[in-house]
């Protein structure tokens, strides 16, 4: 800002006129593209996948109306996505209230246009606001719709919400339904890459909620596919939630009923765990924050169970009546309501607001659950006994907390002796580092920023709370952690407003023990200690493992991949690849080497299931057959049976050891390489009919066509006249420049935190300007809970099956 010579004060900005012409109104497409967050929540992962859900919800509404049985969702390789259903199809034809506009175009370009506002076409629906598919159109780079209706196929395309042409007939059909394909607009959306697992989680929910609805989701980028169809409906959902648990009764308690226009479906089952997992839905929309239907269920559940137990004098030995938390301990339940006019709190529909629903749900649960308990006394007594045990455990835990509190450990007045607190008291600015080991904790205390960084060293492996929850408060390390966080634990003591730190960092060694400790800490934060960490941003520290010294200057890199990137940067700055066809260096050489590294990484993944040398030969275009694989067509003359690649000698050695069945069906138009001492050019298009081989061949062809011409036989020349190295393949180029880049470098690897002094810990791990963080987020609570129960729980057999099933996919194996 300029300052006047006389006073040194800032020059005032020019006045801004604020009059009637300052008031503007955004409408339709312009409003959505200008403020997308108002319609889809945000422009990151949530909003991106919200676009898909809006389209899918329309297909599900067709299913609710009884007109759709199949939905297919496909993520395409170009980043687009398509949704196909076999419903009635969007109506096509002139619209009576929009002269000159087709009904299909009205649906896709007019906000709040649809057939879900009356009680005609749809009795219930989730897409009440009428902006869903229109927003998808407006926020897409391109959008295409194909409608099969009344024996005719109609198509229309859009670019950023603007129609290219009116809907047109393109053929006849005996099918029906709507096919929508779109590609998110990167100029509006910050994230445009769809996550297969995120979509699968939501589509699985929809298949559970709509018994018999068949949903397929496929990812063409990775060839992953999930096929969902559950005839058991939400009962199957509850069984899925409890599949890694020991259940209290064999089958879920389920019932469906309706009262005053509200349809209620409930399924629930208790297990021997301690956490409640209740998922609520309104018109198939996942109401993450609950609402009136959840409130009604909780009230009715507690009242009905207490009434049944008191009537039979089943809790006469208890010192106090069990609470709602006791009744829901170990409960997995799914609550689904369907109503004509749902009222959601906000466009994102995360909480149901219909006040009348609470009373109706409460009445229906009272009646249905009460009847079930009377009719099945064996199950009822097991449930009541479980609740009684939960009440006794809660009272015992309260007594233990009070005992510990009297000793000054859990109360707010005394902090753990190990904790080196920070000076700031604002939780939003405070950071807590949970450090493995007292030695590393001491160095971290010396190297930290005392203003806002607190250090809590923990010794050894903490308790696995997934297995030993009852003993949790007897563990000194767990009590220390709870006390340091400050927001308590359990329904009675938990208060999120008392959290002392809103950012938590886990710092462990880069070895198997450190990984184990980090897993135990994450288990505690995901299980019963979840409430203590709910307000915190749980962050796992990715510590930098290498120190590179070059020209007397130190630089830290976090892992081997980053180290290779660093070496590649150095190599491309100085090294040159000399060929008769020209010289490669700088950015061009770096681009080539990055492609080769990617190729080698993909080849390494293939090695887990097949011989990587054969894969490499196939990808490079070798014409392999049963004869060549067994060695009968091996070396010698120029027969077609031999590998025609510069690296054929290395590949030949593996032929005899490879199973001929790996490439059972050789292509009739095999790909081969015509090689000369200086040039390689592809002379075919296909390599093998094996799908994985075709995918890799496509990539390899692109690599060779763009970068490998002229990079066959040649020489790698190092800087400052270090000499030349003759090479015969791009892999040899990569090895040569890597070796040259490492000359004169000092390389030190840090495996343990204790190996670093305070200054190094600050530079690599704690300095906000240079540290690298890995944030831990729970995007799929169901899958998260299942994996923790499976891998950290008491049941051994499911864990062994999981390990055997995924053994070949392991990435970090410590032997």
Swiss-Prot record:
Entry binding sites for Mg(2+) 1: 436, 509
Ranges for region Disordered: 1-21
Signal in keyword set: no
UniProt-annotated binding residues for Mg(2+) 2: 509, 511
One Pfam family of this chain: DNA_gyraseB
Domain of life of the organism encoding this protein: Bacteria
Function: A type II topoisomerase that negatively supercoils closed circular double-stranded (ds) DNA in an ATP-dependent manner to modulate DNA topology and maintain chromosomes in an underwound state. Negative supercoiling favors strand separation, and DNA replication, transcription, recombination and repair, all of which involve strand separation. Also able to catalyze the interconversion of other topological isomers of dsDNA rings, including catenanes and knotted rings. Type II topoisomerases break and join 2 DNA strands simultaneously in an ATP-dependent manner.
Name under which the protein is recorded: DNA gyrase subunit B
UniProt lineage: Bacteria, Pseudomonadati, Myxococcota, Myxococcia, Myxococcales
